[in-house]
């Protein structure tokens, strides 16, 4: 994917060398928030494995970097579920460095991820928003997602019960047409 320049940052494809920075950003969210239902953050090695799985499957992982190359946030899309019938649906994940939230980095990452997912042939993108994350819900709404469902009290973290909100957005032609391989 080509680089995209933002105000004080650029967005480009992630590489395995980004695993340490990605792990650090994610660890903060695991320890101090409810955006992830993980209780203990993964190690740098585990994050490198997760990234390799997504990148190795030819899927999408983007990072936003400041001019010095520091990772400010990341977003990725992978197949929504493993079963073959889900092959046209992807799930996005977005995490921004806690010091850089509210600057539009998440919106820029998600907008580019949507374009890349459309080019990849996905027809639906799902945002799975865990816990109490109104900023993530606003971000997804701003990028054209609508609420598709809510599972109540399915997680427990930080002494409370947490919901999971599913938000969905059609990509490209969505479900208006069959994929090319089926229409031949």
Description of each model-found segment:
Residues 173-184:
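Acidic/histidine-enriched, glycine/proline-rich intrinsically disordered or flexible terminal extensions
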Residues 23-51:
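Conserved GNAT-fold acetyl-CoA-binding loop/helix
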Residues 117-129:
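Conserved GNAT acetyl-CoA-binding A-motif
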Residues 41-99, 110-111, 170-172:
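Acetyl-CoA-dependent GNAT
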Residues 76-79, 126-129, 141, 146-163, ...:
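Conserved catalytic-core motifs of GNAT/GCN5-like acyltransferases
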Residues 101, 127-137:
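Conserved beta-strand-loop-alpha-helix junction that forms the acyl-donor binding cleft
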Residues 10-22:
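A short beta-loop-alpha structural element at the N-terminal edge
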Residues 102-115, 138-142:
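Conserved acetyl-CoA-binding loop-helix of GNAT-fold acetyltransferases
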